[in-house]
């Protein structure tokens, strides 16, 4: 198959200099290397990419040998992280081949079979994410019509949607995220397949789904994301204890406003919002007198959080903060004037106050 090679223009100031250096170093060492995926998609749309990924024909061991400050990570997908500081690294992946190892349910459990650039294209999820940028020629290499789909604002799956979702059900979540982020349409076959295969999310480890949930809701269009998850039947496989409510939508609106204003949003706020109704219900069910005791509320919180972690992992620090937010609601609603100063000085006060209002 002959790809389209198209010279493209975008603001070169948005290119990460370290990522370009990595590509140039790999080329100098005799390998092929390209910037690939979401960073190219975002650059062509005029967005500043959050991450820059690189694909190469060098094996992880060869990449590691080329860069002193690097490490090989992963079992399911072996990657190389090239370190530039304590907080910054550039991720390099070797071209994947079409052959993969799957579980009985069809989920890819190992994808460390290496191939060519063309092989790698057809291991990617959507056409708009299968664009490779050659830093030498300033051309984008496109095997699957991704450039045209990007212009048309349409998300298309590479390959059969059902088979690709069976390989990796997280692709359904990614499809929703890109649909909202790019204000795009999903091709009909892709859209229908998400609704049909939503149950496959149960095959994904809760720890991996946690990372995807953070990506879904830490943006300025979280209400649209929530609605799409509901429409496709995905929400119940992420937050089975969560129901649609005006409270949730108001909280997500607050989240969007904070992000648009350049303020940060903690995952604890999102999880506390989504699980608040389930927590409240558990408190009511287990309260023996009119006013719930602190231990009753703690037990209710732990019950709800334990159920949630069966679907999406909540790290210990996150579950602790969520409990703090919930318990502080009762303190805020029944605040003794003598204890106001102590309450306001609590490090969780701002999150709890935003939650209350």
Where are these regions (language model features)?
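Catalytic cores of the polymerase beta-like nucleotidyltransferase superfamily
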Residues: 1-357
């Amino acid at each position: 198959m002959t790809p389209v090679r198209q010279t493209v223009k975008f603001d070169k100031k948005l290119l990460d200099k370290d990522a370009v250096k990595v590509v140039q170093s790999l080329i100098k060492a005799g390998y092929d290397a390209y910037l690939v995926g979401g960073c190219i998609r975002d650059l062509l749309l005029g967005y500043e990419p959050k991450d820059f990924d690189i694909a190469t024909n060098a094996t992880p061991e060869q990449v590691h040998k080329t860069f002193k400050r690097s490490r090989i990570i992963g079992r399911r997908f072996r990657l190389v992280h090239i370190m530039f500081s304590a907080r910054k690294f550039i991720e390099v992946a070797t071209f994947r081949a079409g052959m993969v190892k799957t579980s009985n349910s069809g989920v890819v459990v190992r994808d460390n079979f290496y191939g060519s650039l063309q092989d790698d294209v057809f291991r990617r999820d959507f056409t708009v994410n299968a664009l490779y940028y050659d830093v030498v020629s300033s051309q984008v290499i496109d095997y699957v019509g991704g450039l045209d789909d990007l212009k048309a604002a349409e998300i298309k799956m590479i390959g059969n949607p059902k088979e690709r979702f069976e390989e990796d059900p997280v692709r359904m979540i990614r499809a929703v995220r890109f649909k909202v982020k790019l204000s795009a349409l999903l091709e009909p076959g892709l859209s229908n397949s998400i609704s049909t295969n939503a149950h496959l999310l149960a095959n994904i480890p809760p720890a991996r789904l946690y990372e995807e949930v953070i990506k879904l809701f830490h943006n300025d269009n979280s209400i649209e994301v929530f609605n799409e998850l509901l429409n496709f039947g995905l929400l119940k496989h992420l937050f089975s204890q969560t129901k649609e409510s005006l409270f949730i939508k108001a909280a997500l609106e607050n989240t969007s406003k904070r992000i648009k204003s350049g303020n940060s949003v903690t995952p604890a706020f999102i999880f506390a919002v989504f699980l608040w109704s389930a927590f409240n219900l558990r408190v009511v069910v287990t309260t023996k007198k009119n006013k719930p005791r602190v231990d009753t509320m703690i037990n209710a919180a732990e019950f709800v959080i334990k159920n949630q972690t069966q679907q999406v992992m909540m790290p210990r620090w996150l579950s602790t903060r969520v409990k703090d937010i919930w318990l502080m609601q009762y303190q805020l609603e029944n605040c003794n004037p003598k204890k106001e100063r102590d309450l306001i000085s609590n490090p969780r006060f701002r999150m709890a106050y935003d939650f209350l209002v």
